[in-house]
């Protein structure tokens, strides 16, 4: 008799736990956009995914074939990676007219700034990071990524020093993922 009560109680707790941990009926998954990351010669390097979050954007990069070391990475204002130098991606995403770059700059307003990423000796990069400076829809007075001309995620040849203008000394654009 005792084991039946225990089993019934355990089953009831399990059912309640399952219902409590299940997604809320009718709740939508967050908006997520993915794009191919390309090298200057058009070679596919991997995938970049940007997911809408309540206070910004979650960015995930999975790539192979990049040069080893630290690299600057930024959100750029246009979803166009069609030229070899990725200049068509424009400047960093921003809300104002005059952009001041640098995560460590007290006067910074550059909404395209992201932390540096590290590529291992094998050329592989796997990173997931969060930005509160930009969002897919421009909510909370952030810069809008998914606007009419889209946006790009650009990886640079060198690390961003987070202070110098205009791009923190990060150098040439070596990889680009366009989002339209």
Regions found by a protein language model. Give the residues of each.
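Bacterial N-terminal signal peptides that target proteins for export
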Residues: 1-12
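Short hydrophobic "helix-edge" motifs at membrane interfaces and signal-peptide entry regions
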Residues: 12-13, 65
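N-terminal leader/targeting pre-sequences
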Residues: 21-180
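Hydrophobic h-region of N-terminal signal peptides that target proteins for export
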Residues: 13-23
């Amino acid at each position: 008799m005792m084991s039946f009560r225990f089993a019934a109680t355990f089953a009831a707790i399990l059912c309640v736990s399952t219902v409590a941990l299940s997604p809320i009926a009718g709740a939508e998954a967050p908006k997520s956009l993915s794009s191919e990351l390309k090298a200057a010669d058009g070679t596919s390097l991997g995938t970049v995914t940007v997911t809408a979050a309540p206070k910004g954007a979650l960015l995930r990069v999975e790539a192979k074939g990049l040069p080893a070391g630290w690299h600057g990475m930024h959100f750029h204002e246009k979803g166009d990676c069609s030229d070899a130098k990725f200049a068509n991606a424009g400047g960093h995403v921003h809300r104002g007219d005059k952009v001041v770059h640098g995560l460590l700059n007290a006067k910074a307003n550059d909404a395209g700034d992201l932390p540096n990423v590290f590529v291992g000796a094998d050329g592989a990069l796997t990173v997931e990071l969060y930005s509160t400076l930009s969002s897919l829809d421009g909510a909370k007075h952030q810069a809008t990524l998914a606007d009419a001309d889209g946006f790009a995620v650009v990886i640079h040849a060198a690390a961003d020093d987070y202070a110098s203008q205009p791009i923190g000394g990060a150098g040439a654009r070596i990889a680009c993922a366009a989002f339209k």
